[in-house]
Amino acid sequence: MPKTVVIPPGTGKPLAPYVPGTLADGVLYVSGTLPLDAEANVVHEGDAGAQTRHVLETIKGVVEAAGGSMDDVTFNHIFLKDWADYGAINAVYATYFPGEKPARYCIQCGLVKPTALVEIASVAHIGKPA
């Protein structure tokens, strides 16, 4: 099955051998997204809400570059560093999915960047029914 690599304009260099998104048969897989600037520095250190907003804006950019919208997101994998940030993450998350919510799971774990508080990976169905 052919696949299309999705790299939005202005995307920084990844931390490992991956791309921001891959589109195959109308399904977009968005890589785990950390709150990083173009030089791979963590932004908004200590602020889980602001980091979540940055991550979701980055994901939104990948989805839009593939021709979709956040309404096309059907599943999110959320990784958080500390359960104490769960409420702040959810408050911001809810603003990006005001209607029907995508399925998701959330786990607490260590993240590749020590000052990152959240990482999200997504799946979206673009151009075809989910």
UniProtKB/Swiss-Prot annotation:
Q: Which SUPFAM superfamilies match?
A: YjgF-like
* CDD domains in UniProt: YjgF_YER057c_UK114_family (cd00448)
Q: Name one GO molecular function term.
A: deaminase activity
Write the record's keywords in alphabetical order, separated by commas: Hydrolase
Enzymatic class: hydrolase
EC assignment: the record states: 3.5.-.-
A Pfam family that the UniProt record links to this protein: Ribonuc_L-PSP
Gene3D superfamilies registered for this protein in UniProt: RutC-like
A Gene Ontology BP annotation from the UniProt entry: nitrogen utilization
Would you tell me the Gene Ontology cellular component terms?
A: cytosol
Q: State the HAMAP family in the record.
A: RutC
Q: What role is this protein assigned?
A: Involved in pyrimidine catabolism. Catalyzes the deamination of 3-aminoacrylate to malonic semialdehyde, a reaction that can also occur spontaneously. RutC may facilitate the reaction and modulate the metabolic fitness, rather than catalyzing essential functions.
Protein name (database record): 3-aminoacrylate deaminase RutC
Q: Which organism is it from?
A: Methylorubrum extorquens (strain PA1)
- Lineage of source species: Bacteria, Pseudomonadati, Pseudomonadota, Alphaproteobacteria, Hyphomicrobiales
